[in-house]
């Protein structure tokens, strides 16, 4: 029986592609850097932020430039929504630390206040390096309150506001219109999922707010006559709006609305896949055991993978170690393919 670790090149390549994707998105949103692509989808700012704060722990420059962007554009971010999408305690602490730093250096007036830090006996190093622990002479006083040790940081002042006409920044146009609120997210979901006739559960999941917040936003929009509700069952309703009228209001010609991607689900699955890969990289196991771990990962995340439209390997057709190859192609490669450019002129519609 062959005993080996997961090929380090596979994990490193996967991590590199996630970091590159994050750089590409933020560069289009105003972070200092070269925007080498022009995506035709609408990004979810808080989902991308929760994702980036984790993957950028291995890319300090990206982490710091995103903080600078947050400082400049703090009034465009929903702290509550960010915490809602931070599904793990460590992610929530990272988000709280980032919000606290941005609030300290921002000139924007918002009603949002980051939660106070927690008592930590042994703070952990924020940045992770394969070459060993980073020496920190002067820890940042804000981050250490949230349990993270990193070098003291001042704003780079290189960031810019998002260009509202870019498809990727569509969410910010709606926030300009409705404020940073559940209403802005509800309208975004209804506009971009217009043909799908989303149910309340779909809207709640994509909006990133509580069910109560989404209900209140929908009721207000229905009362205002800009959203239409149809009773489809005793306890089931569908919602829609006049896409042409909204496109005209927003100055979007020929109904060329951005593509919808279910970013919270997709980015969370990608993050969990990276964590899983890194854990396998540290231990030796047979090809059979690695394939067994892959089978377990698919089973643990089957609901999310199927919701994203990922075609899962047939466990009956691929037995034992034979499961690994189709897993790599059908799951890993497919998820990465969804991060490839979707241009304003046309492209793959991910996760519709």
PLM-predicted stretches and their roles:
Residues 174-183, 231-255:
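Short, cationic-aromatic polyanion-contact patches
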Residues 188-194:
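Short, locally clustered residues in the helix-turn-helix/winged-helix DNA-binding domain
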Residues 208-224:
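Short amphipathic alpha-helical interaction segments
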Residues 157-188:
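Short alpha-helical segments that sit at the start of domains
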Residues 195-206:
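Short acidic, hydrophobic short linear motifs in intrinsically disordered regions
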Residues 1-165, 252-352:
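Long, low-complexity, charge-rich intrinsically disordered regions
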């Amino acid at each position: 029986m062959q005993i080996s670790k997961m090929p380090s090149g596979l994990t490193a390549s996967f991590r590199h592609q996630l970091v590159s994707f994050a750089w590409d998105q933020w560069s289009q949103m105003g972070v200092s850097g070269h925007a080498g692509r022009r995506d035709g989808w609408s990004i979810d700012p808080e989902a991308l932020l929760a994702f980036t704060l984790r993957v950028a722990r291995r890319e300090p420059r990206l982490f710091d430039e995103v903080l600078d962007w947050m400082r400049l554009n703090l009034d465009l971010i929903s702290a509550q929504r960010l915490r809602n999408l931070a599904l793990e305690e460590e992610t929530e602490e990272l988000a709280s630390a980032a919000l606290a730093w941005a609030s300290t250096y921002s000139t924007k007036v918002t009603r949002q206040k980051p939660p106070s830090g927690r008592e930590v006996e042994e703070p952990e190093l924020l940045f992770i390096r394969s070459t060993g622990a980073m020496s920190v002479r002067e820890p940042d006083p804000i981050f250490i309150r949230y349990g993270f040790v990193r070098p003291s940081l001042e704003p780079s002042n290189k960031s810019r506001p998002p260009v509202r006409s870019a498809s990727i920044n569509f969410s910010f146009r709606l926030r300009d219109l409705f404020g940073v609120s559940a209403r802005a997210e509800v309208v975004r979901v209804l506009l971009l999922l217009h043909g799908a006739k989303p149910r309340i559960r779909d809207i709640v999941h994509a909006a990133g707010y509580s069910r109560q917040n989404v209900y209140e936003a929908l009721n207000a929009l229905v009362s205002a006559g800009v959203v239409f509700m149809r009773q489809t069952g005793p306890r089931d309703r569908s919602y829609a709006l006049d896409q042409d009228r909204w496109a005209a209001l927003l100055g979007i010609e020929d109904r060329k609305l951005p593509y919808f991607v279910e970013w919270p689900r997709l980015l969370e699955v990608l993050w969990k896949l990276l964590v899983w890969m890194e854990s396998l990289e540290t231990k030796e196991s047979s090809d059979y055991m690695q394939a067994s771990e892959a089978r377990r990962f698919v089973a643990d995340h089957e609901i999310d993978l199927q919701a994203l439209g990922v075609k899962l390997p047939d466990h009956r057709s691929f037995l034992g170690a034979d499961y690994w190859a189709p897993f790599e192609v059908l799951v890993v490669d497919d998820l990465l393919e969804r991060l490839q450019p979707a241009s304003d002129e046309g492209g793959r519609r991910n996760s519709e």
